[in-house]
Design a protein with these regions (language model features):
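Thiamine diphosphate
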Residues: 1-10, 16-18, 68-69, 73-237
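Conserved thiamine diphosphate
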Residues: 1-58, 235
Length: 237
């Protein structure tokens, strides 16, 4: 139709808030299946600021998925017990916009590695980074790619990483069945299949409603230990 819809919708969601299926469920797969929406999901304060400002400047509808577990509701500590506080540069994004540049649609390699690639987004970026540190003590170096934007997602950055490492894990917090991670994995396989040394893996939450119980919620979503085991299995010789 050609009509502009300059609207940004912020949706708080995600685990570690003990709010059950009403607020903790990850719904990105619902939204990515609706053509025409731009979907962003920051993993840190700087990206949260930049992506929100850039979304506001677009003539298209943007869904901005903000993870409640990263808010720092517990004295500046996330639901995973970490501090991701940082001084946010409010000028850089404006300079990019003035130059016609944008972070939307561009993934970022947040950790370099040569043995395996983890592609992920949102709060799972921090789980991936912790798992990567775990296995680095055993001589395995993992590259972590933060998508930042789900639609359009930066397939090129992901493919280039997998062409280098030869192994792929896609990590999502949402339930495994029907998750967006399968779309990401399929797209990468189309271009990098012959370079894969092991079958690619999609890690997601158990196929169950998000429990209110802290113990049960922690059991259903991907943990550092689960991701570490998958890395070690993929890199076993």
């Amino acid at each position: 139709w050609g009509a502009e819809v300059p609207m940004t919708v912020r949706i708080p969601l995600g685990a570690k808030t003990r709010s059950g299926p009403f607020h903790a469920n990850m719904i990105e797969s619902w939204l990515t299946n609706d053509p025409g929406l731009i979907i962003v999901t920051p993993s840190n304060p700087q990206d949260a600021y930049d992506l929100l400002i850039e979304s506001h400047h677009l003539p298209d509808p943007v869904v901005y998925l903000e993870h409640i577990g990263l808010y720092g509701l517990r004295g500046g500590i996330t639901g995973w017990g970490k501090s991701i506080n940082q001084i946010v540069d409010t000028e850089a994004v404006m300079n990019r916009l003035d130059n016609g540049d944008s972070s939307i649609g561009k993934a970022r390699v947040v950790r370099g590695g040569e043995d395996l690639t983890i592609v992920t987004w949102g709060a799972m970026v921090h789980v991936a980074l912790d798992a990567a540190e775990n296995v680095s003590n055993r001589g395995v170096e993992v590259e972590v790619v933060d998508l930042r934007t789900l639609v359009p997602f930066d397939s090129g950055a992901c493919i280039n990483s997998v062409l280098k490492t030869g192994r792929l894990i896609v990590l999502q917090e949402s339930q495994w069945t029907g998750g967006f991670g399968h779309t990401v994995s399929s797209r990468i396989i189309e271009e990098a299949f012959w370079r894969l040394e092991t079958p690619p893996v999609v890690i997601g939450a158990l196929d169950t409603p998000v429990p209110f119980s802290p113990t049960l919620e922690d059991h259903t979503i991907p943990s550092i230990e689960v991701v570490s085991r998958h890395i070690e299995r993929a890199c076993a010789k």
